[in-house]
Amino acid sequence: RHVDTPRQLDRMVARVAAVRAAVGDDVDVAVDLHRRFSPAMAAIFVRELEPLRPLFAEEPCHPDNNEPLLALARQTTVPIATGERHLTRWGFRPLVEQEMCAVLQPDIRHCGGLLEMKRIAAMAEVHQMALAPHNAAGPLGVAASVHVAATVPNFLICEGGACLGEGLFRTPLRLANGFIDLPTTPGLGVDMDDEAIEAARDATFNLRAMFWHEDDGSFADC
């Protein structure tokens, strides 16, 4: 649901503070706000986050609402991240040229692929913005994103889910101490397990879990 009351805001700040207290100052903490704040509430929230020094605050308000995003970026010391819903370098151009954020998050599935992500990263580099590829679709997106990340100087961090190819790749990606070993074999460096993929065709996924609802069950997705 949307965060639209001080009570909700205080509860979320407390959660971030609890995470910071648990992991200490040597672990980076990024906060994904998932467009759930109005510009006014987002301004209050990121100000409350400043003492906790998050790596970035992702999509505090709607990513297509450019003017409030720009105003927010200019009034806080918390780096603002956005871009997972933007398409091609032309879609990222206003974000970069007007410096609406500190971190760009192109998704390789729909930003235009490997070369387009590199172009977006180059645009960002000129404005001293970081690249943090978004990925919420599976290990193949991670494999493609880390190849781009390894070739750009302004790479910050790469998003990935719990699966790094287990049960889908013959040799899953390897994560150790927060780093993924870059595959060295041709292409994306992963070999799909066709039999495992065929066996997974009948798997189900609860799309309802991706939407927000108010306490009374009414639809609340933005």
Predicted segments, located by residue:
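Metal-dependent enolase-superfamily TIM-barrel catalytic cores that perform enediolate-based chemistry
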Residues: 1-76
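Acidic-enriched, low-complexity/disordered segments with a strong bias for Aspartate over Glutamate
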Residues: 4, 10, 25-28, 32, ...
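Structural signal for hydrophobic packing residues in well-ordered secondary-structure cores
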Residues: 20-23, 53, 149-153, 201-204
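Shared catalytic-loop signature of beta/alpha-barrel
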Residues: 47, 53, 64-187, 191
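C-terminal extensions of enzymes
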Residues: 168-222
